Amino acid sequence: KSKIGVINFDPMPKMFFNKSLKNFKLSSTNQKINLLKNLSVDFIITKKFDKIFSKTKSINFIKNILSQKLDSRFIFVSNNFRFGNKREGDVKFLIKNEVKYNYKVIKPKPLFIKKKIVSSSLIRSFLEKGILNKANKFLNRNWSIEGIVQKGRQVGKKIGFPTCNIDIKDYVLAKPGVYAVRVLRKNNFKTLKGIANLGYRPTFNQRKILLEVHLFNFTGNLYNKH
């Protein structure tokens, strides 16, 4: 029986080459893995994308990884897929080597919703404009992020309104504002309801965007928790 697998690069090549690119990821590696598992993918390979791997020639990627290591028979890629050192490989190059390495390239047709192609760039645009209902529709799920609770100034706690400060790292973010949220803790399937503020703290001269979440009817210490 053939198995379906997905290759994921971490960090994303685009972020690796452009260090100034922040708030770009739609999902973490862990989220991608969980989403793919729900789609009955048999195996997921998360390949570390570093300086050495970035210099891999496109033909060597086909030969050593797609052919020898994975024994690929069908390779699914989008029309704009590029790979290999300096993005030298493309879909045409993959097709050119089909016979030699005994695989078949398949280009899935674009998915349309209301005459718009579903794409990560469009979803990012919806989020940045605060159009969450459309972002969720194109994601086919509710937009979510995950992170570690960090210790903040504890100002909220002192005034009876404690908040969890979430490390948002490189996620693409929704438009700054106040949102109703549902929270899941790692290894705990009970959903907690709360309210979140995504934005800056001008009164504290805070220039970095923050995600602060206040949980309803909850007491406990969540510092350093996921």
Predicted regions and their residues:
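Core alpha/beta nucleotide-donor-binding catalytic domains of modification enzymes
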Residues: 2-68
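A structural signal for isolated positions on well-ordered beta-strands in alpha/beta enzyme cores
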Residues: 3-5, 43, 74, 104-106, ...
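Conserved beta-strand termini and adjacent loop/short-helix elements that scaffold enzyme active sites
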Residues: 7-9, 47, 108-110, 152, ...
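Generic domain-boundary/flexible-linker signal
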Residues: 15-17, 55, 86, 207, ...
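Classical nucleotidyltransferase
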Residues: 55-163
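Phosphate/ribose-recognition catalytic cores of enzymes acting on nucleotide-derived substrates
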Residues: 151-226
